[in-house]
C-alpha cells in the first residue's frame, strides 16, 4: 500500500469560557471533548519520524490557536504520533487485493477528524449492503504490479 509517514502533534486544552459543542476548523481544528476540554491540532511534519512531542510543534499550535479563539485556556496535554498519508491525499479504503480477509480504512491524513465518519459509513455500506465505494477512496485505484 502506498502509505507515507507524517508526524502530527496535538494539544488538549481546558477552556471553560470557550463553550462550544461543535468542531471548529480553521488553520487547525478545535474539537470538544466534554468538561470544557478540547483537542487542538494538528501539526504536519514530513521529516521528524519520532512520536515525541516537540517545543516547535507546541509553539506552532499555540500561535495558530491565538488566531482562532480569544479566551483563556490551560494546556493539559501535548501528544504526538505518526499518521499515515497517501499520495493524492485520498484515503485507502476497501478489501485488500492480496489478503482478502483484510479490510483497509487508512490514510485519512490531516482531514481524518473531518472525513473519518463519512469514509467509515461508506465502507460499512460497501461491506454490509454491497454498495460501491467512492472511486476516489477505493483501494483498487492502486493496482498491484505483478512481476513476470
Predicted regions and their residues:
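Active-site substrate-recognition segment that forms the wall
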Residues: 1-99
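Flavin (FAD/FMN) cofactor-binding core of flavoprotein oxidoreductases
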Residues: 63-148
